[in-house]
Structure formats: structure tokens, C-alpha cells
Amino acid sequence: DEEGIIENMKSFINAFSWNKGFKQYFAVKATPNPYIMRLLQKLGVGADCSSLAELILCEKVGITGHDIMFTSNDTPYVEYKKALEMGAIINLDDITHIDYLENNHGSLPDTFCVRYNPGSLKEGGNTIIGLPEEAKYGMTREQIFEAYKQLQAKGVKHFGIHTMVVSNELDIDGLVGTAELCFNLAVDIKKELGITVEFIDLGGGVGVAYKPE
């Protein structure tokens, strides 16, 4: 099993070797196993966390800083606090959490990511996690522009965009379509706000073909 994990991950990372800024994050909730986390860490893979328990797992295996992407929903401050103490990238799910974080923590880190819900703009791909327009997660396009304005005014310097509208996706067109939505949004943000989106986080993951067909 270990050899298979290493071989597959090396192959996946190599497929994106043309992109010098590429970084793979492993969704800890998928398999919260510290041995697998250590194995992937040795290959340069970060951790995508969505709870305090997952952050603690990362801490135990030595994953810290921007090697952690903290993406959660309806998040209590105690979880944000732990993520901030570990230097994780905070991926904001809700625009109201900007003030919530500042009021509770007293200051904001210089890097933030925001979670984009494209609603009906999404085309193609599977619906394992449902339709975006019916989902509880993420911000609308208008909210993201407002969130960026607020964050910039509060001193944030580095910005990212995240979205997760597919899961275990086997259709290349669905994956490409999701990426295009985010990159087009980044271009519009640069044009309208003058803010450069430095990284784009495509959640959901490339699917695994469990059967030969």
C-alpha cells in the first residue's frame, strides 16, 4: 500500500511539474491517518483541514504553516485560533467571518483565501456534493469582491481563491471548467480591484477510476 501511495503521488505531482508553484494538499478528513500524513509530507504534500481534530493531527506529525489549508464551515473561534497559531492559510467560507475573526483574535494574518461558490455558473462535472446554488458553503462573486476590499483595508497582502464544486471527478472537462471559473474570477479581481490573486486552490480532487472502464 505504501509503495502504491508513493508511486501514485509522485506521478500526480510530476504531471504538474510544468507549474513551479504547484502544491498538492491532502484532505485529512478523507483518511485521518498520521502514518499516511507523514508519508505524504515527505513527498511535499500539504494538508487540507476542516476541524480542530485535523489540525491537532497535523501538529502531531509536524505539518505547520502554509502547508496547512484550513477550510471549514460555521467555524468556532477556538478552531480559527488553533489554525492561526499554527500559521495555516485561512480559507474563509463566510464574509461575516472577517469581522468575527478580527473581533475575537485582535489581528489578521497577511494571507487569506476565500471560498468561491459559483452558483449556476458551474458547467459540467459530477454532482456528488450537490449543486453549488443549493449549497451552504462559500461566497458569491459579489461577496468575494467585497471580502477582498475589506481584507485589503485591514492590511492583508496575499490573496487566494478556493472552490469545491466537484468531488472524485473523472471528467477532465469538469475539472477544466472549474479551473476556468476561478482563473477568470482572478482576472476580473485584478482588473476591478488591482489585487493580484497569488494562488488558486481547486478542491474536490481528481477522481480515482475504481473499475477498468
Feature locations, PLM:
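An N-cap/entry alpha-helix motif that binds or orients negatively charged groups
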Residues: D1-K20, Q24
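Active-site-proximal beta-alpha core segment in soluble small-molecule metabolic enzymes
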Residues: F22-F199, V208
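Conserved S/T- and glycine-rich ATP-binding loop of Class I adenylate-forming
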Residues: I5, V114, L202
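A conserved active-site cap/scaffold subdomain adjacent to cofactor or substrate pockets
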Residues: G204-E213
